[in-house]
Design a protein with these regions (language model features):
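Glycine-rich phosphate/pyrophosphate-binding beta-alpha loops
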Residues: 14, 139-155, 218-219
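Phosphate-binding core of ATP-grasp and ATP-grasp-like enzymes
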Residues: 33-41, 48-93, 101-133, 139-147, ...
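Short, flexible turn/loop "capping" segments at secondary-structure junctions
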Residues: 8-10, 83-84, 226-231
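Active-site nucleotide/adenylate-binding loops and adjacent lid/helix of ATP-dependent enzymes
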Residues: 1-43, 63, 93-105, 109, ...
């Protein structure tokens, strides 16, 4: 039954993903997914309406034991061409402790069944409007959009170093569950149209919350509308004093953040 979600199984950056609400739109969604699939493999799934924000963050297992799990609040730009391309993330998540605990237990069960050992994972989860928790996707690699870096900022847990050490056969240290040190957000800078990049404006009132500004384009560079993660032009890492402060800043981005494109 509809709605459905149609996506490639081997793409990245949320490219080729479409929500389908009626049968007459299915063919176009299938063609779009195939266009972005490397090997021509796609999947059609039930679309699960979410409660709060979905989560997309990184976690780490050591010798098959899930030593560290993180959950984020994944946010989207409803005005972007790619409505399923994450436009911002924040930590902690909008889930409650019971929901996160249930997901952690199920993730551990999954890794045990798959005989996983020592690895970093990009994990997408959500809570449905029915109150049930769902594991949407588990990839045995670090996520894009600097997620492991954001987790290092927000918790101090360094999965990047741990992943490299594991890859070369060295011992892995420092992977343990730690609390979040404040309220963190990552904004994926992007343009809402094709054109030439002109400037990035951040109001003075918000500058004190900016921990890192990473702009990947220069004035005059070509930029494209936000259809996939590959269309991002940079990131903004911010830290706030409260969840309310963070939420207000993300919801009112248009008032203090502007990307000029000619």
């Amino acid at each position: 039954s509809y709605p459905l979600i149609v996506k490639p199984t081997d793409s990245a950056g949320s490219k080729g993903v479409t929500r389908v609400d009626k049968e007459e739109d299915l063919k176009e969604a299938l063609e779009y997914a195939f266009k972005h699939s490397i090997k021509g493999n796609i999947i059609v799934e039930e679309f699960i309406e979410k409660q709060g924000c979905s989560s997309d963050s990184d976690s780490f297992s050591v010798n098959g034991v899930l030593q560290f799990v993180s959950f984020s609040a994944q946010r989207f730009d409803e005005n972007a061409a790619g409505t399923f391309v994450p436009a911002a993330y924040s930590w902690p998540s909008t889930m409650n402790m019971q929901q996160e605990s249930e997901l952690r237990s199920e993730l551990q069960r999954l890794l045990t069944l798959l005989h996983m050992k020592t690895a970093v994972y990009n994990i997408e989860t959500r809570v449905g409007v029915n109150g049930k928790t769902y594991i949407m996707e588990v990839s045995p690699r670090g996520g894009g959009n600097r997620l492991s870096e954001m987790v290092r900022y927000s918790t101090g847990v360094d999965m990047i170093t741990a992943g490299v050490r594991a890859a070369v056969g060295d011992s892995v240290d420092g992977i343990e569950q730690k609390p979040y040190m404040g309220h963190w957000a990552e904004i994926i800078l992007h343009s809402d149209k094709d054109g030439l990049f002109e400037s990035l404006y951040i109001s003075k009132s918000m500058r004190s919350y900016v921990i890192e500004e990473d702009l990947w384009v220069m004035k005059g560079d070509a930029v494209h509308f936000f259809e996939g993660a590959n269309n991002a032009i940079g990131t903004l890492i911010m830290k706030f004093n409260s969840q309310e402060q963070l939420k207000e800043a993300l919801e009112k981005q248009g008032e203090w953040l502007h990307i000029s494109v000619d």
